Structures are given as structure tokens and as C-alpha cells.
Amino acid sequence: MYVENSYLSKQLCFLFYVSSKEIIKKYTDYLKEYGLTYTGYIVLMAIEDDEKLNIKKLGERVFLDSGTLTPLLKKLEKKNYVIRTREEQDERNLQISLTERGKDIQNVLSDISQSVFNEFNITQEETQNLVEDLQNFVTKNFDKTVEK
């Protein structure tokens, strides 16, 4: 149980941890229906409609290394959400793109974020301010750019 005046309640990293954990739990409830984890969801949402991305670029976009991405992409490929193809010029370079099923599911999944945040006591304006503040925090402190 969350205790407002506790030492932990004043710790930024604890508040990030609790928020992240609880938000992901809400997403998980919605994603079960599609056989997806939260990580699978963010990977699918990170690939643009007709885009081909190599694993390195995709990893940078979702802040995951290739060791985490490779097995996840294999699972997404088995579900026919993505296709992995090798470049003819350099077979070491694996390109990731959405299948038609992946594009269809991406359209369905795009509404999940709004559904999740409708369950919280937060206004649209507060949500937007929080997103902007966190984008700035990540960009300034972790030498990573969050695509806006």
C-alpha cells in the first residue's frame, strides 16, 4: 500500500517505478487478448506503416538491445505481426517491417493508450504535460532522444 508520508513516497525513482509498474499492468490487461506483452506492444507501435528498420535502429527507438529484441521479434514473426528479411548487399543486416496483420493490429492497439489513461484520474492536459516533462527528462539525462 502506498503511504503518502513515507520515505519512499518522496523518492523520484520509487515514484517512477510504481507508476511504470502499475501502468504496464493496465496495458497488460488489454494486450492479453492479442497475445502481446508490453514490450511487444511498444516494438509494434515503434515501426511506421511501410517502414523497414534494422535491429539497431529499432533498438535505439525503443531503448532495447539486440539480445532482448531478437527473441521478441521471433515471437512477433511467429504471430505474423512482423517480417524479418536480410538485405541482399549485406546479409548480416536484418530488416524488420510490419506484415499486413501487423498493420491491422497496430491500428487496433493505437487506441489502447487512451483506454489505459482513461482509467486514471488525470486530465488530457496533465497527461500531455507529463509526457513533455518525461521526454525532456530522458533527453537531458540519458543522452537519448525520445522521438516526439
Swiss-Prot record:
Any one Pfam family match given in the protein's UniProt record, by short name: Staph_reg_Sar_Rot
Cystines in this chain: none
GO cellular component: cytoplasm
UniProt keyword annotations, A-Z: Cytoplasm, DNA-binding, Transcription, Transcription regulation
Domain HTH marR-type: 9-139
Chain residues forming the annotated DNA-binding region: 55-78
Domain of life: Bacteria
Subcellular location: Cytoplasm
Principal cellular location given in the protein's record: cytoplasm
GO molecular-function terms, A-Z: DNA binding; DNA-binding transcription factor activity
Family indicated by similarity: Belongs to the SarZ family.
Protein name according to UniProt: HTH-type transcriptional regulator SarZ
Taxonomic lineage: Bacteria, Bacillati, Bacillota, Bacilli, Bacillales
Gene from which this protein is expressed: sarZ
